[in-house]
């Protein structure tokens, strides 16, 4: 994934995305790459409805539904580039 370094470097561990998700798709997991020592993860991508509330809530533009869910899922949701 060509975006991973840029994306992971911008997460500040604020949990805004987790709180914004209406379906609890996201959760915070331990990660040493940021000050908060936690990062947003999406273990339940099959439950994502593509509402983009997580993207809107993110103050650093860390989240991208397209990056998290992959091409096949975003195509089926009509979100592909």
From Swiss-Prot:
Q: Does the keyword Disulfide bond apply?
A: no
Q: Name one GO biological process term.
A: photosynthetic electron transport in photosystem I
Q: Which GO terms describe its cellular component?
A: photosystem I; plasma membrane-derived thylakoid membrane
Q: How does it sit in the membrane?
A: Peripheral membrane protein
Q: Which PROSITE patterns match?
A: 4FE4S_FER_1, 4FE4S_FER_2
- Output the PANTHER family linked to this UniProt entry: PHOTOSYSTEM I IRON-SULFUR CENTER, PHOTOSYSTEM I IRON-SULFUR CENTER-RELATED
Q: What is this protein called?
A: Photosystem I iron-sulfur center
- Please report the organism this UniProt entry assigns to the protein: Microcystis aeruginosa (strain NIES-843 / IAM M-2473)
